[in-house]
Amino acid sequence: MKRIKLFAAACLLTLISVSCTQYNFEDSGEANGNHNCTMWEYFSKDAYNWKLLQEMITRAGLEDVFKGTSSYGKDITYFGATSNSIRAYLFENGMKTVDEIPVDDCKAFVLNGLLTKRKMLDDFKEGRKSSDPNVTIGTGGETFEMASGKQFWVYTFRDTYSGVPGAGPKRIYVTSLDTSKESAVASSNIQTLTGVVHSMDYDFRLRDF
């Protein structure tokens, strides 16, 4: 009986470990730890979340940006779309692989998420979404020009938790002034030697930027 209990406990721990590793971007808040490697190498280590983004980056000819060898240097911030978002784009457009996406589109999608300065979660200003659905920019926050030339209004906000306003984790919200769509960051402060990654929610869509 004791052996059975120990075996069951081991199985449970294994399942929890796999779940936390595979779906670590579903929960809001900060990602764990620093990564002593380039951003490109970090993406390579987590194929589940970043494989399709890497394929898009390669197709766009922008690997050097994430390896820290481009003119942007080694202090970039990247709002990264996970493979789930890219997979949804392929499905919605009747495509099966990233190679079917036009090169110019790949380049635009990649550069839309690139901010050419290092910004951690606490570096972004607090703000609040406008109560008027026709007004794109709310109060606070800050507007940034991305490497693609698009402008994003970015702010942080603490959500409600257990019915208490402001008791939840601080999250980053990104609003494209082109599309007027707001997107949430799932995990922030993923630090690498060539910049910081803020991973977008799994329900983020490439056209939202």
Outline where the language-model segments fall.
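Bacterial N-terminal signal peptides that target proteins for export
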Residues: 1-8
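C-terminal motif of bacterial Sec signal peptides marking the signal peptidase cleavage site
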Residues: 15-19
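Mature, structured domains of secreted/extracytosolic soluble proteins
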Residues: 20-209
